[in-house]
A protein has these predicted regions:
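Conserved N-terminal entry element of GNAT/NAT acetyltransferase domains
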Residues: 10-31, 164, 172
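Conserved GNAT acetyl-CoA-binding A-motif
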Residues: 109-121
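Conserved acetyl-CoA pyrophosphate-binding loop and the N-cap/start of the following alpha-helix
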Residues: 92, 96-104
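Acetyl-CoA-dependent GNAT
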Residues: 26-85, 89-90, 102
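Conserved catalytic-core motifs of GNAT/GCN5-like acyltransferases
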Residues: 117-119, 131, 136-157
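Short hydrophobic/aromatic beta-strand or adjacent loop that forms the aromatic wall/cage
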Residues: 56, 160-165
Length: 172
């Protein structure tokens, strides 16, 4: 605290990519909806995004000045955080940007977070990605997608019904 005003330190990191370009990860503090096109890649219904966007911390990853990925993280309990949305533009997928963003989150929340959660559909694409990032199965919410979305959600040709939660113990 400085006087009676709380101080919040905002920072960005920069790292070199394999192409020798600078990768930057920065918080988004205002006008988060400017990234709606990217957010909708991970969560197809805007009304669902509205449930967590303003209460969550948002980050964008850019390389060479061009946005590649974004994520939104919410605090669910004192030491439990959840990745609510993580998306990479299709032309940049499978190039390590999502994993870099998750690794950044692990460092960013270290010391404040005991458990990091991520919820996803029962997808043959998403679950192996999160497992590769160190997450393990936690639990599932049956019929989450069919009960909460106004249209069927498909990924890799499969209709998503249950929300599958994975967790990572941050003490490991």
């Amino acid at each position: 605290m400085f006087g009676s005003m709380p101080i919040r330190i905002i920072f960005a990191i920069q790292i070199r990519s394999n192409s020798n370009e600078m990768i930057s990860i920065q918080p988004v503090l205002h006008n988060k909806k400017q990234y709606l096109d990217l957010l909708l890649l991970a969560d197809e219904q805007e009304s669902m995004i509205d449930r967590y966007l303003e209460r969550g911390e948002m980050f964008v990853l850019s390389e060479g000045g061009s946005i590649r990925a974004s994520c939104v993280v919410t605090r669910e309990a004192e030491d439990v955080f959840e990745i609510k949305n993580i998306a990479v533009y299709p032309q940049f997928q499978r190039q390590g940007y999502g994993k870099k963003l998750i690794q950044y989150l692990f460092g960013h929340y270290a010391g404040r977070c005991r458990t990091m959660l991520v919820g996803t559909g029962d997808s043959p694409l998403a679950i192996p990605f999160y497992e590769n990032c160190g997450f393990t199965y936690s639990h599932r919410i049956p019929d989450f997608f069919t009960d909460n979305y106004d249209h069927p959600i498909y990924e890799a040709g499969k209709q998503l019904k249950d929300m599958v939660y994975l967790k990572r113990n941050m003490d490991e």
